[in-house]
């Protein structure tokens, strides 16, 4: 995603000028900075060679994404930066269930999204994140939402992003989920299976209710 850390008013002014003129690319970083980040995260020769072998595919993927997404212009969003976070917490709420994991920051970067460094230990998840995600999803009347949280020492967990799409493979790695009573349920699931299950259950309840109403009308 096109997310940058702006540290001065001068940088903010420059960014506004850019976004309200020629605009900016929807997919960052550039090829070389992405290559450097991947190389810096290697842990040995074999890992290094694997990264090098994958780079042509990564470059093609970035080029493809940039073709699909036009330059962004005419708007700019600013969000408070919350320092001191080594990770964010991704919570996916589906039908009263909450799946969660930590995404560790990229080396030398403040961002966790897209790092691929995921920790699935449920004991590390702040239960406040679970409660907030389930409540917001219910309040919005949504069936499925993904939340990204960071933690502020004074304010506690803060939502930095809400999405309706997410990577299913990362979700499937969760060893279980919490229900709306914060009871833990073991098992691995695919989000699309749960969404379909909930949809069919809702249709079944609707059909049963409709049938009951028709029978009541006929008796009258």
Name each model-derived stretch:
Residues 41-43, 50-54, 98-99, 110-114, ...:
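Short acidic/polar alpha-helix capping motifs at helix-coil junctions
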Residues 124-127, 135:
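Signature of lipid phosphatidyltransferase scaffolds
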Residues 1-75, 127-130:
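Active-site nucleotide/adenylate-binding loops and adjacent lid/helix of ATP-dependent enzymes
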Residues 1, 113-119:
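Short, flexible active-site loops
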Residues 47-50, 60-61, 103-107, 118-119:
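Short hydrophobic/aromatic-rich motifs at helix boundaries and adjacent loops
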Residues 119-124, 151-220:
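C-terminal active-site "lid" helix and adjoining low-complexity regulatory extension at the edge
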């Amino acid at each position: 995603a096109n997310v940058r850390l702006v540290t001065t008013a001068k940088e903010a002014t420059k960014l506004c000028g850019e976004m309200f003129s020629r605009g900016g690319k929807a997919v960052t970083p550039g090829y070389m900075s992405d290559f450097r980040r991947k190389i810096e995260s290697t842990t040995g020769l074999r890992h290094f060679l694997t990264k090098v072998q994958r780079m042509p595919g990564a470059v093609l993927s970035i080029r493809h994404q940039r073709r699909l997404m036009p330059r962004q212009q005419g708007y700019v969003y600013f969000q408070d930066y919350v320092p001191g976070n080594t990770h964010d917490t991704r919570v996916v709420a589906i039908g009263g269930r909450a799946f969660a994991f930590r995404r560790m920051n990229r080396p030398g970067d403040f961002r966790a999204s897209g790092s691929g460094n995921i920790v699935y230990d449920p004991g590390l998840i702040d239960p406040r994140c679970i409660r907030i995600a389930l409540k917001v999803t219910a309040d919005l009347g949504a069936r499925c939402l993904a939340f990204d949280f960071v933690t502020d020492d004074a304010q506690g967990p803060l939502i930095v992003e809400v999405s309706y799409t997410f990577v299913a493979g990362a979700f499937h790695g969760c060893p279980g989920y919490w229900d709306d009573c914060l009871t833990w349920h073991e098992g691995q699931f695919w989000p699309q299976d749960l969404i379909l299950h909930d949809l069919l259950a809702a249709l079944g309840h609707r059909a049963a209710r409709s049938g009951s109403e028709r029978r009541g009308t006929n008796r009258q």
